[in-house]
Curated annotation (Swiss-Prot):
The gene is y03B. This is Uncharacterized 8.2 kDa protein in Gp46-Gp47 intergenic region. Pfam families: DUF5487. It comes from the Viruses. InterPro entries: DUF5487.
């Protein structure tokens, strides 16, 4: 399993645990707070992407639409 993390805004961090096989990415997105412990929300995904950067951009859009 691979791991990626990035800041969403001043309050939250996105964490992504995923596996990659060819163009298929399967994983979990979970959002944590910069000021409190624990997971704020999470979602699973099983999608096809062109590459890692495409997966990250999709994740950012997904988080904005569905999680925060």
């Amino acid at each position: 399993m691979k791991f990626s993390t990035f800041d969403i805004n001043d309050e939250f961090i996105a964490n992504i645990d995923y596996t990659e096989e060819d163009s298929r990415y399967v994983g979990i997105i979970y959002i944590t707070s910069k000021t409190a412990q624990g997971v704020v929300c999470m979602a699973e995904f099983d999608e096809y992407f062109l590459d890692y950067d495409d997966m990250i951009e999709w994740s950012k859009r997904y988080i904005k639409r569905n999680l925060l």
